[in-house]
């Protein structure tokens, strides 16, 4: 007799071979099921990345002009901004190799803050940042230019691994450099107050900006190596500005027409509701799967197809098979159609209409594994 079981001969799946194959075939669920990881095309840094820089607070117009002149001469600068644009950290290389960080804060700056931002975000200064589209939308909301962005580390991280799921600075830095950064709550309008210590928080802000620069230096050549640079520079990166402008402009909605459409739906729902009650022999909660199941398979004794732990299944597939058995079924399906229209397209949209009669959805480039753009707050793809 054989002295081993089938389990003794099981071998671990070759992740390096299966991952690219499953990605090509779009077997994303199998990638998750078997815990497959992408091949280590980008080796982790052997030495910890030094994120310390020489920092200077810029408070005067004269000093700002000096730095802006240096920024224009630099090959690129790396910057992060607070969500309300009240603070900006800019890293750049001065001379041959000296890393310098300049910090700008509205509360400390003696000059025209908007003039400074207009200069900083013009095309004269080539900028690397993280989540560029979000920053560009904020700039547009403040009447500022959105030019000169040459790299977005979040977008590059997504192209290099669309299955990672997390593309914040800390997650990307941990994945590629095996170093842990402080919680990414430093980008707060209120002078980083949640960290408790302003000096500590400002240090974290500098560290994150330096981390973005380190990611840029790693990601840019990797995009070339994987022949993703054309897709990145000709499609994905320019798309950031397009989406930012779309979010800023919004989509005009006629609230009165939407309300009228909603009223039509309510009339249809009320009419169908009464017909369903008549067929069922009395009122019940049509939206309750349990009560609906009790009516259909208990009271009306229709043939039950599926039963779950909580009761009979009343999903669309089950109901469609029951259409020949009773006229109530087609009315329930029609009721659900109008209910969906009312809840998704009337109730779901009316609360998102702004004072200017526009809906401003958020378009995301890094949410899906297939590369398509997703929409949220509200999800316009449902329409």
Task: Kindly give the residue locations of the regions a language model identified.
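Charged catalytic and DNA/RNA-contacting regions of genome-maintenance
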Residues: 89-94, 112-220
């Amino acid at each position: 007799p054989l002295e081993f079981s089938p389990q003794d001969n099981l071998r671990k799946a070759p992740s390096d071979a299966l991952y690219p194959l499953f990605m090509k075939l779009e077997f994303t669920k199998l990638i998750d099921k078997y815990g497959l990881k992408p091949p280590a095309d980008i080796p982790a840094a052997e030495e910890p990345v030094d994120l310390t820089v020489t920092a200077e607070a810029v408070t005067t117009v004269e000093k700002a002009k000096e730095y802006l002149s240096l920024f224009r001469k630099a090959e690129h600068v790396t910057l992060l901004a607070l969500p309300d644009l009240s603070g900006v950290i800019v890293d750049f290389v001065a001379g041959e190799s000296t890393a310098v960080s300049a910090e700008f804060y509205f509360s400390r700056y003696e000059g025209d803050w908007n003039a400074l931002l207009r200069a900083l975000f013009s095309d004269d200064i080539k900028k690397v940042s993280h989540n560029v589209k979000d920053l560009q939308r904020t700039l547009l909301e403040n009447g500022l230019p959105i030019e000169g962005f040459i790299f977005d580390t979040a977008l590059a991280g997504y192209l290099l691994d669309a299955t990672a799921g997390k593309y914040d600075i800390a997650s990307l830095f941990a994945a590629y450099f095996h170093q842990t950064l402080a919680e990414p709550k430093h980008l707060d309008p209120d002078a980083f107050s949640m960290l408790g210590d302003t000096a500590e928080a400002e240090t974290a802000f500098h560290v994150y900006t330096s981390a973005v620069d380190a990611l840029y230096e790693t990601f840019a050549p990797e995009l070339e190596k994987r022949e993703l640079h054309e897709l990145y520079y000709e499609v994905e990166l320019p798309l950031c500005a397009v989406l930012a402008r779309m979010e800023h402009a919004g989509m005009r909605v006629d609230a009165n027409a939407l309300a009228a459409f909603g009223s039509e739906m309510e009339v249809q729902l009320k009419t169908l509701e009464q017909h369903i009650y008549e067929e069922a022999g009395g009122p019940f909660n049509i939206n309750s799967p349990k009560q609906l199941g009790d009516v259909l398979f208990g009271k009306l004794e229709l043939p039950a197809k599926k039963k779950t732990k909580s009761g009979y299944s009343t999903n669309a597939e089950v109901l469609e098979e029951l259409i020949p058995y009773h006229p109530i079924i087609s009315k329930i399906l029609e009721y659900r159609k109008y209910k969906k229209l009312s809840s998704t397209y009337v109730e779901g949209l009316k609360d998102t209409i702004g004072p200017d009669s526009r809906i401003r959805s958020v378009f995301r480039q890094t949410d899906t594994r297939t590369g398509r753009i997703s929409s949220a707050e509200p999800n316009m793809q449902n329409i």
